[in-house]
Amino acid sequence: LAAVDCSEHPKPACTLEDRPLCGSDNKIYSNKCDFCNAVLESNGTLTLSHFGKC
């Protein structure tokens, strides 16, 4: 199972780094920061499906 450490988030601003992750909502997040912010907003219901595009 793929996992991402979101302990340093949320962050007010994310970089434009392009390292896509696919969320359990079948949405592509451009990088870990964007994904982690979304995870925290979802109260933990969003999880990582896999690294790379969906």
From Swiss-Prot:
It comes from the Eukaryota. Avian ovomucoid consists of three homologous, tandem Kazal family inhibitory domains. It is found in: Secreted. The lineage of its organism: Eukaryota, Metazoa, Chordata, Craniata, Vertebrata. SMART domains: KAZAL. CDD domains: KAZAL_FS. It comes from Argusianus argus (Great argus). GO terms for cellular component: extracellular space. Pfam families: Kazal_1. Its main location: secreted. Signal peptide: none annotated. The record marks 16-17 as: Reactive bond 3. Disulfide bonds join 6-36, 14-33, 22-54. Keywords: Disulfide bond, Glycoprotein, Protease inhibitor, Repeat, Secreted, Serine protease inhibitor. One of its GO terms (molecular function) is serine-type endopeptidase inhibitor activity. Residues 4-54 form the Kazal-like domain. This is Ovomucoid. Glycans are attached at residue 43.
